[in-house]
A protein has these predicted regions:
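Transmembrane-helix signature of polytopic, membrane-embedded enzymes
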Residues: 6-37, 195
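Extracytoplasmic catalytic-loop and juxtamembrane helix elements of membrane-embedded
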Residues: 106-115, 127-163
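Short acidic/glycine- and proline-prone juxtamembrane loop motifs at membrane-interface regions
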Residues: 43-53
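Short helix- or helix-capping micro-motifs
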Residues: 28-39, 63, 78-82
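Hydrophobic, aromatic-rich transmembrane alpha-helices
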Residues: 167-201
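Perimembrane helix-loop-helix junctions
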Residues: 62-80, 87-122, 181-185
Length: 203
């Protein structure tokens, strides 16, 4: 758990460095301060949960996104989708749209990258999880089957549509919540990544 917590901190440090390069030193310092006072993130930093592992990879993808390293950002998110959390496709989708719109990558290059990383991640997760569960297994495929095809996600419990905005995000983000909203109006360079994350939450 200590190693996992250190990996979480290292991924946040990568975001801090990228934020400094993108938005300046004051923004990087504010990110450190906000990260230190957010209880939920630090509480789960060393817990062996899929969301914790996915969070590390997504933080690395965020740092790459801020630095304009599009291949690395897309590769990280693709791996996280296949191995840890399939719903991260909703975060990858707007990134791919932006990359194609601004012609950072061609569609062929994007598809080649996604297929290559996805295949490698699939081989890794099937090999590891099949070994430990002693049967052929792709965990995220089973989750999708249960939640989507069988439509049984409601068995985990349901919440109103506004729950993320009125309960989960305020508790998780604290002061960063209103600041993220303000950045849409005040920081044009932040809009793409904020809107992409907003799309992820809404959908």
């Amino acid at each position: 758990r200590l190693t996992l917590a250190m990996a979480t901190v290292a991924s946040l440090c990568a975001v801090r460095r990228a934020a400094r390069r993108k938005f300046g030193g004051a923004s990087a310092k504010a990110f450190v301060l906000l990260s230190c006072v957010q209880f939920h993130h630090l509480f789960y930093a060393g817990r062996t949960l899929p969301n914790t592992f996915a969070g590390i990879v997504v933080a690395c993808a965020t740092a790459a996104w801020l630095d304009g390293q599009w291949r690395r950002a897309i590769g990280c998110l693709t791996a996280a989708i296949v191995i840890f959390r399939a719903e991260l496709l909703l975060l990858l989708a707007p990134l791919c749209v932006l990359v194609l719109y601004h012609r950072h990558l061609t569609f062929f290059a994007l598809a080649k990258l996604g297929i290559g990383v996805g295949a490698a991640a699939l081989a890794a997760t099937v090999a590891v999880d099949s070994y430990f569960w002693r049967r052929p297994l792709w965990p995220e495929a089973e989750v999708l089957y249960f939640n989507t095809l069988l439509n049984k996600s409601g068995e985990y419990g349901t919440s109103p549509f506004h729950w993320y905005f009125t309960s989960a995000l305020p508790r998780a983000l604290l002061a960063a919540y209103p600041l993220a909203a303000a950045s849409l109006a005040l920081v044009p360079k932040a809009r793409p990544i904020v809107l992409a994350n907003l799309f992820f939450v809404v959908v």
